[in-house]
């Protein structure tokens, strides 16, 4: 699927800056490239029109990687695979894909009707449910993004990232923003929007 290979290509281009952002061991960019190359391969090998199968395979492959980011993506992909059982990826399901992938297995998404706000609030709940700290953190992130000129969708993505496991460290927040932006841009351009 072109969607994930485009993310992998973008991560290759940004590998050095992601490594520099990783204050712990300076290898986050390397791991992110590896993670998305594995996801790309697994999704390509999946039966045609079976995104869930590809995501589940990628999740299993990532469990073998000795990386905190791989562990988080593995959990998120497993959750995404469950969500996408019998469902295709389209403009209406991009937010749940981003939420589950970047949620580290803790995103709360449900199938069915609901807008962006429902998706955002659902993703903030995590395993322990939504609390005031989650709302304030997401709201502050949303407001900051809007002040920086981001669209509502970009600001919502920033809010999701800031309140997720991926937002707990600067290097993971940086790579998550890249991943989410590329997923959105690629899907929008593929749909002609």
What does each model-identified segment do?
Residues 1-193:
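Amphipathic alpha-helical interaction segments
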